[in-house]
C-alpha cells in the first residue's frame, strides 16, 4: 500500500549527511531495513540534542516506542551515494509524538519521506506517559 506523506518541516529541523556503504546495500541499492535504521539513528541523535534521548529518559524509567509509521520511497539510494537526511518533530497530540524524515541526494533530489508516531512509555508500568508530565 502506498501512502502520501505530507510534511511541513519546522524550525527544530536536524540534518545529517551520510554516504551509503556496501554493507548497507543489496544488489547495489540500500536495503529497506537500513533505510529505517538510518531514520532511527538521526532520530536518536536529534533526541539527544533536545535532551530527551535514551540516556536522558532511562534514568526516569521512560522510553520511546514507535506506534506506527509510513513512508513514501521514490527511489532507493545506491552504494556510494552521498545523502542529506533531515528530520523534525511535530506537535504532540493525544500522547503521540510525531517525527518526520526526508532523504535527499546531495543535489536535493527527494528520495524518500516518512512519518512516524512515537509514544513515551513508562518502563515499569508499560503504559503511555504524557510528555508534558515529564520533568
Predicted regions and their residues:
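Hot-dog-fold acyl-thioester-processing enzymes
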Residues: 5-66, 109, 113, 122-135
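Hydrophobic residues positioned within well-ordered beta-strands of beta-sheet architectures
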Residues: 14-16, 69, 85, 99, ...
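A short acidic/small-residue loop/turn micro-motif
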Residues: 118-120
